[in-house]
Every structure is written in C-alpha cells, then in structure tokens.
Amino acid sequence: MEEKVAWEPLDVRAIERLDLNVYSRQLGLLGVRGQLRLSSSKVAVVGLGGLGNLAAAYLAASGVGRLILVDRDVVEPSNLNRQVLYGKGDVGRYKAVAAAERLGELNPEAEIEPVPEALDPALAEDLAREADVIVDGLDNWMARLWLDAASWRRGKPLVHGAAERMHGQVTTVERGRSSCLACIAPSNPERAGCTTIIAPTVGVVSSLEVLEAIKLLTGVGEPLYNRLAVIDLTTPRIEVLRLAQMDCRACLSRLKGGEDLASLYGV
C-alpha cells in the first residue's frame, strides 16, 4: 500500500542539480518528487560494520543527499569479507572516515559527515535531532535502546536491523505509529554482538533496512510498523510477525513520563 503524502510543487532548480541519468532506473518507482525528497533528506547510519556499511552504500547510491556515519571502530582484516566499502589499505583507519571517502566517490553530490566516536545517550540525542531517519547498524542492544529512546523523544523513525549467521530481522519504530524497539529487546541488552556472519546475510538485511528508509522518506510503500520481518536464509524464508505492545515496560514508562532504561533493564 502506498502512503499518501502531501502534494508539493516541483523545485525546478533542485531538479536541474540532479543527475537524472544516474537515477533513471528508479524514477519509474519513486518519481521525480520522490527522488527530490531523497536528495533533500539526512539519514544517520549508526554502526558501519556489515549492516551499516552496505546500508550507507545503498543510501548514497540511491541519492540520499546527506549522510551521517557513526562508528568509533577501525577497520580490521576480519571485516573485509563483508564490509565492501573498505580495502586492505584501510586496515587501521577509522571506519567512519574510510567509508565517507568511498561514498564521496560513489555520490560526489552527497554531503557525508564521518563521526568516528562511540555512541552514547548524548550523541544519540544529537542524531535524533539532526536526522530525518536513523538506520541501525549496531551489534549491541544497549546502544540500540539509546537510539530508540532518543528517536522516540524527537519523533523520528528508527529502522532496526540485526544479522547473525544466516538469520536476520528488520522493523521500523516511530512514536505514534508503532511499538518501540524495547518491545523486542532481549532481557539482557548488554549481550555481546555476534561473531559469526556471512556476507550475503548482511546484504539481504541491509537491503531491507534501506528499503524501509526509502519508504519513510518518499512515502512509497508501507513501512514495517508493528511488524518484524524475520529472515531465515537457510531455507530461504521471510516471515513477517505482528508485534504487540500490550505490556512493554518501556512503552508504559514513556506514557507515564519515565525514561530510565537502567531501571527498566537492570543495567
């Protein structure tokens, strides 16, 4: 189902700045207005490992005009089997800086801001204030919950993705439209990230995340509000589960004006 968006006049100067030859294959789906929305949007990609690396590449290639890339880590040899923005010459460099350089080559018109810092609640708040959409490329739940809380306060959509081995999941959360990310968080959000992954898994999951972001920015398609896409690539199969928010402690706490994740999760 296509979400109805408010009609807006075409900005002729903005169209002239677009290289429509680059985006000709997607204009039939998004239209010129949709492409202009992408070019005027800002997306924060948090975590530039397997998921965030590919998500950033697809977003830049699709014509998103401004990207914020957040990751404190440096490139390691074990990243190179799936994190295609890096090469052997990037080992030891900050992921955010190396990715920004590569994306600048892919889309010279885009504004790309590398942030080689660790995510904390204050940075999550800054990202939620600045970005139109936040894309989760993280590998730990506590950091995801910081993003969830900040995006909820700011009323910004957060696209969540996770991948391990040959499995993954994707959903979109937004205040007033869906349950929150805490509804599907594990009981121990400080659980370590995955250590076993194969490149095609992050390719599939990151593609679904980018599609969610494009839906949100253009109004084309139906985001996964209150639904969780569960991906099993051993079969392969994608099952979409309905999410309920009947007794989510975080949702109830927010409705009552509380935001204490530490007390909610015992961390």
Name each model-derived stretch:
Residues 46-47, 70:
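Conserved N-terminal Rossmann-fold NAD(P)-binding element of oxidoreductases
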Residues 6-11, 64-107:
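Glycine-rich phosphate-binding loop and adjoining beta1-alpha1-beta2 segment
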Residues 1-44, 259-267:
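N-terminal charged helix/coil linker that caps or initiates catalytic domains
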Residues 35, 56-57, 148:
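Generic hydrophobic/aromatic pocket-lining and core-packing "Φ" positions
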